[in-house]
Regions:
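Alpha-helical transmembrane segments of compact multi-pass small-molecule transporters, enriched
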Residues: 39-43, 104-118, 202-206, 265, ...
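Hydrophobic/aromatic residues within transmembrane alpha-helices
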Residues: 23, 32, 92, 118-124, ...
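Loop-to-transmembrane-helix transition segments
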Residues: 2-8, 56-88, 105, 157-167, ...
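Hydrophobic/small/kink-forming positions within alpha-helical transmembrane segments
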Residues: 14, 45, 79, 83, ...
Length: 329
């Protein structure tokens, strides 16, 4: 059952990536991310209220138990890790082709596996080491494909941010295992709905000061530029400039769709991890299979280039996941 849920989460995550690329295209990154966390919070807010008032039964899969600081401190750290991944990933995805970012994200299971070695003391078998090697080779060939589009993996800051996003995502996956695992297994034993609901709320609260700071920074730049020329026009609340983006903000239907598909994908993901026998490495690997959806739809929707070369690179990354699966059986 958990395997079926993992594949479902992967499909939802693929559409999430496509909508995210559409939402970010020529748009303000910080404003889009702030609204994504806002809409995600709105999705879970009714569940928290219904659970607190007793309208939802504790036996419901949507029930959110009440909890204190001892639980919330773990969720806040989860929110920080995920938000760091999203900030890096959003900036990278706006500037890079989806057919480049997708395969980079697909290497995340390898990072999770390597992290499991150092954090949980796990040992890799021959199949898993073969998978790691395939991922490294695939990443190398992906860098060569990027050069055909003028993207130098060694000196491109957006590539660095994409890799950092994947690294933070791998840390988040390992932290999920720690949070959801029962105490007798060395984990915290948190309820999955508590984690998913409240980390969305905390992310939105964290994004508010980020948005205000970036708005103030952008307005300050506008004032310096316009002194002695013309009076600066009153800026819209969400039309600021930033270090990475000077785009104006425009609301699109794809923005709430990002939140909807993300929440659905994460709900299925967290539920899968709570089922008996669920393996975090395998679930994480299957979720990265979302790259097939985002790669195919992204290639058609955004008319991206060098697809033949990138398809070979992607095949190597997917082959690495097959080896990881064989090694995890």
């Amino acid at each position: 059952m958990w395997l079926v849920l993992a594949f479902t989460s992967a499909a939802l995550l693929g559409f999430y990536d496509v909508f995210k690329k559409q939402a970010l295209k020529g748009n303000d990154v910080v404003a889009v991310l702030t609204l994504n966390t806002f809409f995600s919070s709105l999705i879970f807010l009714p569940l928290v209220i219904l659970s607190a008032t007793g309208a939802l039964s504790p036996d419901s899969i949507f029930y959110v138990p009440s909890c204190g600081w001892e639980v919330h401190k773990y969720v806040i750290l989860k929110a920080v890790i995920v938000l760091a991944s999203w900030l890096c990933g959003y900036f990278a995805l706006k500037q890079l082709p989806l057919t480049i970012v997708g395969p980079i994200n697909a290497t995340r299971p390898v990072m999770v596996l390597l992290g499991a070695i150092f954090v949980f003391g796990e040992r890799l078998n021959l199949w898993q080491w073969t998978g790691v090697l395939c991922a490294i080779v695939g990443f190398y060939f992906l860098s060569r494909s990027g050069k055909r589009e003028g993207i130098d993996f060694r000196h491109n800051r957006w590539i660095v941010l994409a890799v950092m996003a994947s690294a933070f995502g791998a840390v988040s996956a390992l932290y999920d295992k720690f949070l959801l695992a029962p105490a007798e297994s060395g984990g915290v034993g948190l309820n999955r709905m508590v984690v998913q609901s409240y980390f969305m709320f905390y992310q939105f609260l964290m994004m508010i000061p980020v948005l205000l700071i970036m708005k103030w920074n952008g307005n300050e730049k506008d004032e310096r530029k316009d002194i002695g020329v013309v009076e600066r026009k009153k800026a819209s609340f969400l039309s600021h400039s930033s270090l990475f983006s000077s785009s104006m903000f425009s609301f699109r239907l794809s923005i709430p769709l990002v939140s909807l598909f993300l929440c659905a994908a994460d709900f299925v993901y967290f539920y899968a991890l709570t089922l008996p026998g669920a393996l975090i490495a395998v679930v994480s690997m299957i979720r990265r299979g979302s790259v097939l959806v985002s790669f195919c739809i992204g290639a058609l929707a955004f008319h991206e280039k060098n697809l033949r070369y990138k398809a070979v690179d992607l095949a190597l990354v997917l082959l690495s996941m097959v080896f990881l699966y064989l090694g995890s059986r």
